[in-house]
Amino acid sequence: MANVVVVGAQWGDEGKGKVVDIYTEHADDVVRYQGGNNAGHTLVVNGEKTVLHLIPSGILHKGKRCIIGNGVVLDPEVFIMEINRLKEKGRLQDDSALLVSESVHIIMPYHKQIDLAREAKSGDKKIGTTGRGIGPTYEDKIGRRGIRLMDLLDPEIFARKLRENLEEKNFILEKLLGEKPLSFDEIHKTYSGYADILRKYVANTSLILCKDIAAGKKLLFEGAQGTLLDVDHGTYPFVTSSSTCAGGACTGTGVGPRDIHEIIGISKAYVTRVGSGPFPTELLDADGEQLRQTGGEFGATTGRPRRCGWFDAMVVRFAVRVNGLTGVALTKLDVLNDFDTIKICTGYTYEGKPVEDLPANLAVFEKCQPVYEEMPGWKSDIRGVRRFEDLPEKARLYVHRLQELISCPIVLVSIGPGRDETITIRNPFA
C-alpha cells in the first residue's frame, strides 16, 4: 500500500495534471486538497485536450473515485459546468465517482466582486490574482464567517448566513471599493438552485478516505499551484491563499500524516511564474521568449503569458526541504531541445555575498542575483524516447546535474504533453 502526495515544486504550472493523470492508474482515490478554480490542469489523452479547474484529474479514468477535500474552496457554478462538460464527453457516467466534502467553503459572488475591485485599486502593487474570489473566500474561512457546503444545503442556515454576510460585504463594496451592492434575492435564488444539484455529491470525505486507507486502498493527493505560492512558505505576499505544500494534504482532507508514504514534487526543466513577485532567473530576452513559445507558457485559467527563466536549483531545493520530497518529476525537458547552451541557477548572491536559502524578506529576494552554471544543449528531438538511457548523453547529464543540485532523486521525466511521452524511472506506488 502507498499513498502519494503530488505537489508543485516551483511557482505552479509545473505539469502536475499530466503526472497525476499517469499516477492515477495506480490509485483508487484521487483527492484534491486545497485551492479553487484559480488553478488549471491541462491533460491530453488520445489527442483530446481537457482542462480541469476543480475536479481532480483522475476523473478521466474509469473506476477511480475523485474526492474534493475540505481544504478546497468551491465555486458551485464552475463545478457544475465542469461536471456537464465531462458528461458531454462521455466521462463521469457514475455520479458516485465524484464526492465533495461537506466542509468545503463556498465561493460567493461578493468574494469575486471584492477580489476584482481590490486588484483594480491596487495599482502597481497588484498581487496578480485571477479574480475568482479565492482569497476573499479563505479570508472568510479564517475569520469564521464562511458559508460551507453543509450550510448551503440547509435553507434556513444558508438564508441567515447569506443575509449576515451580505450586509457586511455590501458595506465594503459600496463604502470602501466604490462598487454597486449585490442583491440578496438574486444570490439566494441562484445558490439555492446550485444546492439542489450538488446535494448528491456531498459526503463526509475524511471518514470515507480513512476507511479506504484501512481497507488497503491507494490514495493520490493532488495539489494545486506550487510550493513558492504557499501562503506560509512562498514569496509572501505574492502567494495564493492556501497551504500548497505537502502538509496541506493532511489538513485539507482529514487524513493523518502517518498515512502519507511518498511525496513527489513536480518541476519543469526550467521555471515559470504568473503574476508579480521575485523571480531571480527570469529571462526578458530571446531565450525567455523561446521558452514561452515552445513551452506554450500561457495560463490554462487566465490565458496570461507566463514569465520564463532558467532552472532555479535554489527554488526546487527549498521545495525538497519544506515538503519532505521523496522524488521529483521533471517535466517539459523537450522544450529545451533547440538550445545551444542551457543555464542552471546553482545559487544566489545578495550584495556580493552568497545566499544560503531562499530569503523570506521580499526586499532581499528581489535583489538576489543568480549564480549560473552552463551546460551544452543536446540539439535533438527527444519526444520519441521512452527509456532514460536512450536520451542523448547531454540530456542525461543535464538531468543528473539537476538531481545533484536539488539533493533529491528524479523519478520521472516528461518529454511531451501526451500521457505516453513519459520516462518513468521509479513508480512511487510500486
Swiss-Prot record:
Principal subcellular localisation of the protein: cytoplasm
Superkingdom of the organism of origin: Bacteria
As recorded in UniProt, its EC number(s) are: 6.3.4.4
- Pfam family example for this protein? Adenylsucc_synt
Q: Which InterPro entries match?
A: Adenylosuccin_syn_GTP-bd, Adenylosuccin_syn_Lys_AS, Adenylosuccinate_synth_dom1, Adenylosuccinate_synth_dom2, Adenylosuccinate_synth_dom3, Adenylosuccinate_synthetase, P-loop_NTPase
Member of which family?
A: Belongs to the adenylosuccinate synthetase family.
Q: What is this protein called?
A: Adenylosuccinate synthetase
